[in-house]
């Protein structure tokens, strides 16, 4: 059985890995990456509060003297 000659393997594997690295880098350079989304300003909704028009006077406690 003949013996497998592995002396040339490093000279074939090294350029192959370098080529794969360069091709990957070029593909990544040409791809478009989207920016992270910016938050939209929220519009505050004004809800109808039924208690707002009712409380028009400020009542003081009966135990306290009247304040002016």
Swiss-Prot record:
PTM annotation (N6-succinyllysine): residues: 54
Swiss-Prot/TrEMBL GO biological process terms: proton motive force-driven mitochondrial ATP synthesis
Residue numbers bearing the N6-acetyllysine modification: 54, 57
Database matches in InterPro entries: ATP8_mammal, ATP8_metazoa
A single Gene Ontology CC term: mitochondrial membrane
Membrane topology: Single-pass membrane protein
Pfam family, one: ATP-synt_8
Primary site of residence: mitochondrion
Record keywords, A-Z: Acetylation, ATP synthesis, CF(0), Hydrogen ion transport, Ion transport, Membrane, Mitochondrion, Transmembrane, Transmembrane helix, Transport
Spans through the membrane: 8-24
Annotated localization: Mitochondrion membrane
PANTHER family, alphabetized: ATP SYNTHASE PROTEIN 8
Function, in words: Mitochondrial membrane ATP synthase (F(1)F(0) ATP synthase or Complex V) produces ATP from ADP in the presence of a proton gradient across the membrane which is generated by electron transport complexes of the respiratory chain. F-type ATPases consist of two structural domains, F(1) - containing the extramembraneous catalytic core and F(0) - containing the membrane proton channel, linked together by a central stalk and a peripheral stalk. During catalysis, ATP synthesis in the catalytic domain of F(1) is coupled via a rotary mechanism of the central stalk subunits to proton translocation.
Protein name: ATP synthase protein 8
Organism: Pan troglodytes (Chimpanzee)
Lineage of the organism: Eukaryota, Metazoa, Chordata, Craniata, Vertebrata
